[in-house]
UniProtKB/Swiss-Prot annotation:
This is Alanine aminotransferase 1. The lineage of its organism: Eukaryota, Metazoa, Chordata, Craniata, Vertebrata. The keyword Acetylation applies. The gene is GPT. Belongs to the class-I pyridoxal-phosphate-dependent aminotransferase family. Alanine aminotransferase subfamily. SUPFAM superfamilies: PLP-dependent transferases. GO terms for molecular function: L-alanine:2-oxoglutarate aminotransferase activity; pyridoxal phosphate binding. Its main location: cytoplasm. Pathway: Amino-acid degradation; L-alanine degradation via transaminase pathway; pyruvate from L-alanine: step 1/1.
Length: 496
């Protein structure tokens, strides 16, 4: 446990030299950083798991971590072909094994030829293996209907988070009323608030419309921008599509409106598109900001600055631990792009295993390849099950009194709104907790279900939510949803 300020004098009294680095002397901006997805509730979940291993009796037999979008931690089986290619790259002696298909061997040989010393253990260039960047560019071109993508505008990264933080770092400048402001959606993914706190930038909240399935309204963007200009200099706008934690998928019309707004107000656009393969609602379709921007033509296509992000952690692969991703920049100033390259160089290079898996993600087996039937079957099975889980989650929550869940159109989460009795709110305040944090802690202690309170993502005053992944196996998901709904009913009776 960290020392509090008043404990330093006790050190001196004991004849110990005061530490150079203390809570008082450390970077104050780091102290302000919060990351709810791995916050106090998750720490308590770890403690409960340890207690269960030690034989301590609980009202449950396991902790179900529905707090984070980690598919394989929740039981998803890895897709075979990417792992075969990775195994061959890590241990090239396996290239002589009859246990691996020929197309996986060809892919591994091609990747190894592009690596320094023909080994995955060598550093790549800081922007990532050039051949893989070229494959990413071809993927983007296919995705966007033939719109060109330049590999020199693509930087591979240690997951999308690493790239997002890099771009934010480029944007942050100024002091006082000239500090950089960044518009982020509320509810938001806490990476953004954490990074802005660390960089001493200003978080400018714009609220998604819960009554319209978490729609993004340009009128709300204008309100947020107008108020922010009184105390900072807004320079960037972030959009998460499909949404995290809210699961909505933006329409093309909405994206066009956002691009016009950003252009008119001279805002750099950050498009967090890591869930682009996770679209479940039949009425929804993913549209990339790059494609829409280009098809809008001048002046937007040639002038609006954009950084778009993707990752191997989500989609159908769920390879979170290998940390692979990329950012594509559009219309970025050439001198700034050089500075971005410099920042990447300081970090040496993204992990090469993550780069390998990214290459397979953007260039999967073709229909003529021997691995295609199995790959396609596994991919479709994962996405079909996620779609079924999204529908089930919405259905069960909306049948429970006091819980309302918008359609989970995409991504990997539901973000239901829960009604909490006034006495529960009062009790939470007495304990110094946010009301939904109090609810989620009680839920964890009594059921073993670990979810993240909505206050960790931001929400309108007087509303309470939690984020829950839809990733648990179907045989566990329905009982989990029913148990959670039953707990809410019990909690409501207790505090009514």
């Amino acid at each position: 446990m960290a020392l509090r300020a008043g404990e330093h004098s006790q050190e001196a009294a004991n004849g110990l030299k005061e530490k150079v680095l203390t809570l008082d002397s450390m970077n104050p901006y780091v102290r302000r950083v919060e990351y709810a997805v791995r916050g106090p509730i998750v720490q308590r979940a770890l403690e409960l798991e340890q207690e269960l291993r030690q034989g301590v009796k609980k009202p449950f037999t396991e902790v179900i971590r529905a707090n984070i979008g980690d598919a394989q931690a929740m039981g998803q089986i890895p897709i075979t072909f990417p792992r075969q290619v990775l195994a061959l790259c890590v241990h090239p002696d396996l290239l002589n094994s009859p246990d691996f298909p020929d197309d996986a061997k060809r892919r591994a040989e091609r990747i190894l030829q592009a690596c320094g010393g023909h080994s995955l253990g060598a550093y790549s260039i800081s922007a990532g293996v050039q051949m893989i960047r070229e494959d990413v560019a071809r993927y983007i071109e296919r995705r966007d209907g033939g719109i060109p993508a330049d590999p020199n505008n693509i930087f591979l990264s240690t997951g999308a988070s690493d790239a997002i933080v890099t771009v934010l770092k480029l944007l942050v400048t100024g002091e006082g009323r000239t500090r950089t402001g960044v518009l982020i959606p509320i509810p938001q993914y806490p990476l953004y608030s954490a990074a802005l706190a660390e960089f001493n930038a200003v978080q400018v909240d714009y609220y998604l419309d819960e009554e319209r399935a978490w729609a993004l309204d340009v009128a709300e963007l204008r309100r947020a921008l107008r108020q922010a200009r009184d105390h900072c200099r807004p320079r960037a706008l972030c959009v998460i599509n499909p949404g995290n934690p809210t699961g909505q998928v933006q329409t093309r019309e909405c994206i066009e409106d956002v691009i016009r707004f950003a252009y008119e107000e001279k805002l750099f656009l950050l498009a967090d598109e890591v869930y682009q393969d996770n679209v479940y609602a039949e009425s929804s379709q993913f549209h990339s900001f790059k494609k829409v921007l280009t098809e809008m033509g001048p002046p937007y296509a040639a002038q609006q600055e954009l950084a778009s992000f993707h990752s191997i952690s989500k989609g159908y692969m769920g390879e979170c631990g290998f940390r692979g991703g990329y950012v594509e920049v559009v219309n970025m100033d050439a001198a700034v792009k050089q500075q971005m390259q410099k920042l990447r160089s300081v970090r040496l290079c993204p992990p090469t295993p993550g780069q390998v898996l990214l290459d397979v993600a953007v260039s999967p087996p073709a229909p003529s390849d021997p691995s295609f039937p199995r790959f396609q079957a596994e991919r479709r099975a994962v996405l079909a099950e996620l779609a079924a889980k999204a529908k089930l989650t919405e259905q069960v929550f909306n049948e429970a009194p006091g819980i309302r869940c918008n359609p989970v159109q995409g991504a990997m989460y539901s973000f239901p709104r829960v009604q909490l009795p006034p006495r529960a709110v009062q009790r939470a305040q007495e304990l110094g907790l946010a009301p939904d944090m109090f609810f989620c802690l009680r839920l964890l202690e009594e059921t073993g279900i670990c979810v993240v309170p909505g206050s960790g993502f931001g929400q309108r005053e007087g509303t309470y939510h939690f984020r829950m992944t839809i990733l648990p196996p179907m045989e566990k998901l329905r009982p989990l949803l029913e148990k959670l709904s039953q707990f809410h009913a019990k909690f409501t009776r207790e505090y009514s």
